[in-house]
Amino acid sequence: MKIKLVRSVIGRPGNQVKTVQALGLRKIGDSREVSDTPAVRGMVKTVKHLLEVQE
């Protein structure tokens, strides 16, 4: 599963900032290939409004 950060984490609650960092994303436009596990899916669901996801 490929994820890309498309919106800033500035002004977001701390748990959302930490979730984005845990997914390995730092700046807008960063993308990463992540494993498709239930844990990662839950993290993506938490910050889905900040990400672009490709299955």
From Swiss-Prot:
One Pfam family name is Ribosomal_L30
The alphabetical list of record keywords is: Ribonucleoprotein, Ribosomal protein, RNA-binding, rRNA-binding
Against SUPFAM superfamilies, the record matches this protein to: Ribosomal protein L30p/L7e
Q: Which GO terms describe its cellular component?
A: cytosolic large ribosomal subunit
> Entry's InterPro entries?
Ribo_uL30_ferredoxin-like_sf, Ribosomal_uL30_bac-type, Ribosomal_uL30_ferredoxin-like
GO molecular function terms listed in the Swiss-Prot or TrEMBL record? rRNA binding; structural constituent of ribosome
The organism's superkingdom is given as Bacteria
Q: Which GO terms describe its biological process?
A: translation
**Stored NCBIfam families:** rpmD_bact
Question: Which PANTHER family does this UniProt record tie to the protein?
Answer: LARGE RIBOSOMAL SUBUNIT PROTEIN UL30M, MITOCHONDRIAL RIBOSOMAL PROTEIN L30
Quaternary arrangement and interactors, per the entry? Part of the 50S ribosomal subunit.
The protein's job, in short, is: Binds the 5S and 23S rRNAs.
Q: What HAMAP family would the database entry show?
A: Ribosomal_uL30_B (MF_01371_B)
Q: Which family does it belong to?
A: Belongs to the universal ribosomal protein uL30 family.
Name assigned to this protein? Large ribosomal subunit protein uL30
Organism of this sequence: Deinococcus radiodurans (strain ATCC 13939 / DSM 20539 / JCM 16871 / CCUG 27074 / LMG 4051 / NBRC 15346 / NCIMB 9279 / VKM B-1422 / R1)
